[in-house]
């Protein structure tokens, strides 16, 4: 039996904006987000386009939800069908994060996604804080939110996903003591945060169909079968999570970065490297635009939900600062080849930091063509600036793995 007294007990809030895209769109149109019928669709011109968000009333009365298709929405004059306004969504999300800073210090906020955040309430009453946040959210933005509260980040997320969205108050709290009664009965396994379809099938073949059965399965057998993921599965099934809400970067620190959630799972190294090159190109372009160069290059790889999430984030500091695409790419390749474990990838990020002004950089004896490559980057930037981002692309962008061509002109992967 797990001795929970050996583990930290915090007051973590997981705040989720209810039908965020649909609700923001409704408020912008002067509609009540709780009672109107509204769907945000990837592209209203394509009948097969995916529903990105549906208002609560549309879900309840018409059965239309995230993942439905445009052609499935009934032709009813009461239903509003709109394209996503990604710039607006990002702006509202940023303002909501600022609202959180009124309740807790910035270092106690972790933005998990555009519509979901974790807050460490410290010694404050977490339930009172949750109610106050809900009240402020409705008063200032006209938006509803649900809140999960837990002794750690995992329990707060589980309280959110599995209970708070079903309660009248929109608030639920899970403590370590609630795990046997609330978590262990959960089935199918994929209802639990962090367990994807592939892992669920693997566990089912081992005779595990509930979280309770997973919690009681021998730890050594799980570790033998799944390695470190087996250890994580076991302890998550007991509600144990030692994740910390990370401190933010120092105010004023400059870096240039780009992160991308891929439109599908990438399993082949060559495909991942193609996307990586595109991202390095964009990071280098941003640095050049500001006449900056950087010495520290960071690579982040996020694994698919089917792989239990996770991933790695590693950095390397080079001798000569750069804003040259291939310099950044070579460094990222080195990090990728060293730390990538062969799992399915769903997100990639690259950051250039340790920034300084781009003025008469010292030429390396082994990089005599540095200045030519540097000037080439500026020429390519100029062409894109004048004729559009699709005017000149690297060959990888025209392969099935490339994303730059499709994402050109989009915000967050969708229409602006």
From Swiss-Prot:
Alphabetical GO biological process terms: error-prone translesion synthesis; SOS response
Domain UmuC stretches: 12-196
Highest taxon of the lineage: Bacteria
InterPro entries given in the database record: DNA/RNA_pol_sf, DNA_pol_Y-fam_lit_finger_sf, DNA_pol_Y-fam_little_finger, DNA_polymerase-Y, IMS_HHH_1, Rev_trsase/Diguanyl_cyclase, UmuC
Pfam family, one: IMS_HHH_1
Keywords from the UniProt entry: DNA damage, DNA repair, DNA-binding, Magnesium, Metal-binding, Nucleotidyltransferase, Transferase
Record's cofactor remark: Binds 2 magnesium ions per subunit.
Cofactor(s) required for function per UniProt: Mg(2+)
Signal peptide, first to last residue: none
Record: active site: 116
Gene Ontology molecular function, alphabetical: damaged DNA binding; DNA-directed DNA polymerase activity; metal ion binding
Positions of Mg(2+) binding: 16, 115
Family as reported in the entry's similarity comment: Belongs to the DNA polymerase type-Y family.
Protein name, per record: Putative UV-damage repair protein UvrX
Organism: Bacillus subtilis (strain 168)
